């Protein structure tokens, strides 16, 4: 049963095996984690901009074979709208702290009832109703 949605920064730590502790937690949670299609898009973008796109895209494909990639759904989009409106109403709209991609990932996690695993807890604390934790 899925419990966690991994943020892009955590995926990068796992792939690079740094720090080692994050890889250990990742291995213990096998079958309970997924990534958002938004995270996959961010990873693919980074790989395409890298000095060795074919190799880095292959690494991403290998990583994605180990867990589920959740499609971004209409339900997630509705959560995005709700979260964005709530942040704007509080006078803390999307800006220097939460990037639009991050907000989509947060909305996706919240819409699926999953805990977002991120190294940016401070960014995501503003999102109402979002469960989050850091494995570092």
Residue ranges and their predicted role:
Residues 106-136:
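Acidic, PIN/NYN-like endoribonuclease modules and their adjacent C-terminal/linker elements
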Residues 10-11, 39, 76, 122-123:
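Alpha-helix capping/helix-boundary segments
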Residues 1-36, 45-62:
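Short, well-structured N-terminal submotif of metal-dependent ribonuclease cores
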Residues 15-18, 26, 47, 84, ...:
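Short, flexible helix/strand-to-coil boundary loops that buttress conserved ligand/catalytic motifs
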Residues 7-8, 43, 80, 109, ...:
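Generic structural signal for small/hydrophobic residues in well-ordered secondary structure
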Residues 29, 65, 127-128:
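Short, structured coil segments at secondary-structure junctions
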Residues 68-115:
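Active-site neighborhoods of divalent-metal-dependent phosphate/nucleic-acid chemistry enzymes
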């Amino acid at each position: 049963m899925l419990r966690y949605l991994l943020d892009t920064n955590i995926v990068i730590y796992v792939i690079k095996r740094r720090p080692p502790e994050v890889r250990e937690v990742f291995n213990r949670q096998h079958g309970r984690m997924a990534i958002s299609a938004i995270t996959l898009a961010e990873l693919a973008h980074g790989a395409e901009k890298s000095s060795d796109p074919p190799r880095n895209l292959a690494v991403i494909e290998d990583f994605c074979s180990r867990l589920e990639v959740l499609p971004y759904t209409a339900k997630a989009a509705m959560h995005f709208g709700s979260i964005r409106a709530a942040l704007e109403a509080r006078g803390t709209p999307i800006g220097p702290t939460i990037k639009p991609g991050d907000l989509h990932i947060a909305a996706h996690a919240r819409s699926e009832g999953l805990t977002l695993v991120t190294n940016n807890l401070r960014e995501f604390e503003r999102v109402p109703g979002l469960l989050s934790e850091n494995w570092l």
